[in-house]
């Protein structure tokens, strides 16, 4: 069960002592399945970046900013930023870690995500390296977030199947109607596909391979590209599955008494933390076909 996994007790040294991205993907899927109200993904990725630094050993939780700081030194909408003691991110071309007091509150209407704006310059600040070193951490975040979205999708499907077996119309369960069956039949395949892509991306990240993007032969083992692919596909699947599940719940799907509304909101909110999906799609296209981009410039 989720409490038995002790997800929030992961120390900065855990990743370096044996936990792989694939291991963490399994735990992240469980966190998504139960909508764990903790910034597990952000903490796991950021803690790995701080491994071996004794001065940060007592910091918990830690997180990372997905976007570089603006001209005023502000990291916007940091996932886990409302509760994190340390934030890692890019500021003025450098990868930095900043320790400061978290605000303890988050903006409303953000799917209950503990996000917040944080300063990249106020607090105890340490330079960890060049901005380019953040690329791998961001890829790890995408893969683990994709895993949480797979967990959301899997539970949303279970809720739908359970409901259509319990809800009766015309004296029979609505799950016996062919239209309902057809609406749910294709979802397991989509969820399994997203899970497979997540674990493929995690395996490539764990291999530390530089990778390649041979789209002509469908031979892609570039960790950065696979991370984006896993994230985008899992986000799309989660939105589709939760939409279908909520639809078959009928009017009850919008009621707070039914859990599907929680999964519906978080499937969209968690996927948008990175930003507009179209931007990520364009970045992935540039990764696949960099010469096309250069030729158009």
Model-derived features: positions:
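FAD-binding core of flavoproteins
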Residues: 35-158, 162, 294-297
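Alpha-helical interface subdomain recognition
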Residues: 1-34, 136-297
């Amino acid at each position: 069960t989720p409490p038995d996994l002790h997800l929030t007790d992961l120390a900065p040294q855990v990743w370096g002592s044996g936990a792989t991205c694939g291991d963490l993907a399994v735990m992240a899927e469980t966190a998504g399945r139960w909508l764990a109200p903790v910034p597990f993904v952000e903490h796991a990725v950021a803690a790995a970046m701080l491994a071996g630094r004794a001065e940060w050993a007592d910091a918990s939780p830690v997180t990372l900013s997905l976007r570089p700081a603006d001209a005023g030194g502000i990291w916007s909408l940091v996932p886990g930023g409302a509760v994190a003691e340390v934030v890692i991110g890019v500021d003025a071309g450098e990868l930095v870690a900043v320790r400061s007091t978290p605000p303890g509150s988050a903006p409303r209407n953000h799917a209950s995500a503990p996000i917040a704006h944080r300063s990249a310059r106020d607090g105890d600040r340490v330079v960890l390296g060049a901005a380019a070193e953040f690329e791998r951490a961001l890829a790890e975040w995408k893969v683990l977030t994709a895993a949480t979205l797979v967990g959301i999708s899997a539970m949303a499907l279970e809720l739908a199947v359970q409901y259509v077996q319990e809800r009766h119309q015309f004296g029979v369960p609505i799950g016996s109607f062919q239209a309902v069956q057809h609406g749910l039949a294709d979802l397991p395949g989509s969820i399994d596909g997203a899970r497979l892509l997540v674990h493929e991306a995690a395996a490539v990240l764990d291999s530390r391979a530089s990778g390649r993007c041979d789209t002509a032969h469908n031979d892609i083992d570039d960790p950065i590209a696979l991370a984006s692919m896993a994230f985008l596909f899992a986000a799309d699947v989660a939105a589709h599955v939760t939409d279908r599940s909520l639809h078959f719940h009928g009017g009850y799907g919008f009621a707070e008494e039914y859990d599907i509304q929680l999964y519906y909101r978080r499937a969209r909110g968690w996927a948008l933390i990175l930003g507009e999906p179209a931007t990520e799609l364009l970045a992935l296209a540039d990764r696949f076909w960099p010469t096309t981009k250069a030729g158009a410039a």
